[in-house]
Structures are given as C-alpha cells and as structure tokens.
C-alpha cells in the first residue's frame, strides 16, 4: 500500500499540481495586496471614500445581516478576477510571440524525382510559350 501511495504521489502531474497550488497561493496574495493597497484606495478616491463594509447593516447585536460586507466582497472578487484575467492575457500574448519567433518553416528539400518533375514542368511551359 505504501508503495502504491508513493508511486501515486510522485507522478509528474501530482507534483505539477502541488507546485501550481503553492504558486497560485503566492500569486493570490500579490493580487489581494494589489487590490487592497492600490486599486481600492483609488476607487475610494473616485467614489468619494465610500466603504461598503460599514454600510447596509441590518439587525442588531449578534444577529446582523451585513449586506455591505457582501457587496464589498463581490467588488473585490470582480477586481481580482479582472487583474488575473489581464495577467493571463499578457502572459499568453508573450508566450505566443515567443512561439512564433521560434517556429520557422524549414524549406522542403526536393528529392531526385521531384527535381526531375520540376524540370519537365519548366520545359513544358517553355514549349507552350
């Protein structure tokens, strides 16, 4: 059983997934910091400093419905999703440019038969002209 588990855990795609989760977590922190410390203060300046987390609170005591916190979370999500979308779009464009630069079509080499056929074609064109 241990051998099977070790085999499963050491497969390439499992390791890739683990690395992706770690990098995704780190990238998530970067995007969250970008949103909280740069984008949201700018949005706050543009909207007159509106902070929805203290707004739209219904009820009292422990039984409170905090609609403002929910709306703020939706706005944060949309901004984070847009930032990730833009980052992925830029990375995709850069990757495509690198692939286009690397891919060069090799010139096809003609073998003896193709060369002979090409000469025959050229001779026929001369006779028709």
Swiss-Prot record:
Principal place of residence: membrane
This protein's GO CC annotations: plasma membrane
Alphabetized SUPFAM superfamilies for the sequence: Gated mechanosensitive channel
Source taxon at top rank: Bacteria
Matches recorded under Gene3D superfamilies: Large-conductance mechanosensitive channel, MscL, domain 1 (1.10.1200.120)
Membrane topology label: Multi-pass membrane protein
Keyword ATP-binding: no
Subcellular localization(s) per the UniProt record: Cell membrane
Transmembrane domains' residue ranges: 14-34, 38-58, 67-87
InterPro entries with a match to the protein in the record: Mechanosensitive_channel_CS, MS_channel, MSC/AndL, MscL_channel
Alphabetized Pfam families for the sequence: MscL
Complex formation: Homopentamer.
Entries under HAMAP family matching the protein: MscL
Function: Channel that opens in response to stretch forces in the membrane lipid bilayer. May participate in the regulation of osmotic pressure changes within the cell.
Protein name: Large-conductance mechanosensitive channel
Species of provenance: Lysinibacillus sphaericus (strain C3-41)
Gene name per UniProt: mscL
């Amino acid at each position: 059983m241990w051998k099977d588990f070790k085999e499963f855990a050491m497969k390439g795609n499992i390791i890739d997934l683990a690395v992706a989760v770690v990098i995704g977590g780190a990238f998530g922190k970067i995007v969250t910091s970008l949103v909280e410390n740069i984008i949201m203060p700018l949005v706050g300046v543009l909207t007159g400093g509106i902070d929805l987390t203290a707004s739209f609170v219904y009820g009292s005591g422990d039984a409170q419905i905090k609609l403002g916190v929910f709306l703020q979370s939706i706005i944060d999500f949309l901004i984070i999703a847009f930032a990730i979308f833009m980052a992925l779009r830029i990375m995709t464009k850069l990757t495509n440019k690198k692939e286009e630069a690397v891919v060069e079509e090799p010139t096809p080499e003609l073998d003896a038969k193709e060369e002979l056929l090409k000469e025959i074609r050229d001779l026929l064109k001369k006779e028709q002209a």
